[in-house]
From Swiss-Prot:
Pfam families: SSL_OB, Stap_Strp_tox_C. The gene is sl11. Keywords: Secreted, Virulence. Secreted protein that plays a role in the inhibition of host immune system. Targets myeloid cells such as monocytes or granulocytes through binding with sialyllactosamine-containing glycoproteins. Prevents initial rolling of neutrophils toward the site of infection by interacting with host SELPLG. Disrupts neutrophil motility by induction of cell adhesion via interacting with glycans but independently of SELPLG. This is Superantigen-like protein 11. Belongs to the staphylococcal/streptococcal toxin family. SUPFAM superfamilies: Bacterial enterotoxins, Superantigen toxins, C-terminal domain. It comes from the Bacteria. One of its GO terms (cellular component) is extracellular region. Residues 65-167 are annotated as: Sialyl Lewis X-binding. It comes from Staphylococcus aureus.
Length: 196
């Protein structure tokens, strides 16, 4: 097999989607301007609002928030800076998952052949941000399906809701910052399809 040279863009995507993430639950966040500050175990996290989340989170103190954090920038600074990913904490105690959905991954293996794998994908939040969904799904594809070992070309993830609405993540670029604050109802996800 020939070794493909990966573009810088693909290497950057691989680096970003392999970053550690933090899933902070049930915190209060303080909004000033377009930044919400969370303190968790003496660690400060500043989250920028870049999209529709600007209209949802009020100035001052906000209770019962979860935040999905991926550090932006590559500095070694002590502060965590992240974008979007804020959702309301689950209203109901769920023993395990909020729901399991079918994750279908199609991967071209030759000129006219495609391998398809189907797995259960667990959703743990009633309200889930596109940031978290996108990040964890790509992480799964990196770990299980060699995403970013080669150029992603026009690979996509498509999340379909029970009402027929859908959300698309293009795998050849990072999720746009203004979408990182978009939130959907995790209970209403019908299925997730990936074309690699």
């Amino acid at each position: 097999s020939t070794l493909e040279v990966r573009s810088q863009a693909t290497q950057d995507l691989s680096e970003y989607y392999n970053r550690p993430y933090f899933d902070l639950r049930n915190l209060s966040g303080y909004r000033e301007g377009n930044t919400v500050t969370f303190i968790n175990h003496y660690q400060q996290t500043d989250v920028k609002l870049e999209g529709k989340d600007k209209d949802k989170i009020k100035d001052g103190n906000n209770e019962n928030l979860d935040v999905f954090v991926v550090r932006e920038g590559s500095g070694r600074q002590a502060d965590n800076n992240s974008i979007g990913g804020i959702t309301k904490t689950n209203r109901t105690q769920h023993i395990d998952t909020v729901q399991n959905v079918n994750l279908l991954v199609s991967k071209s293996t030759g000129q006219h052949t495609t391998s398809v794998t189907s797995t259960n994908y667990s959703i743990y939040k009633e309200e889930i941000s596109l940031k978290e969904l996108d990040f964890k799904l790509r992480k799964h594809l990196i770990d299980k399906h060699d995403l970013y070992k080669t150029e992603p070309k026009d690979s996509k993830i498509r999340v379909t809701m029970k009402n027929g609405d859908f959300y698309t993540f293009e795998l050849n670029k990072k999720l746009q910052t203004h979408r990182m604050g978009d939130v959907i109802d995790g209970r209403n996800i019908e299925k997730i399809e990936v074309n690699l």
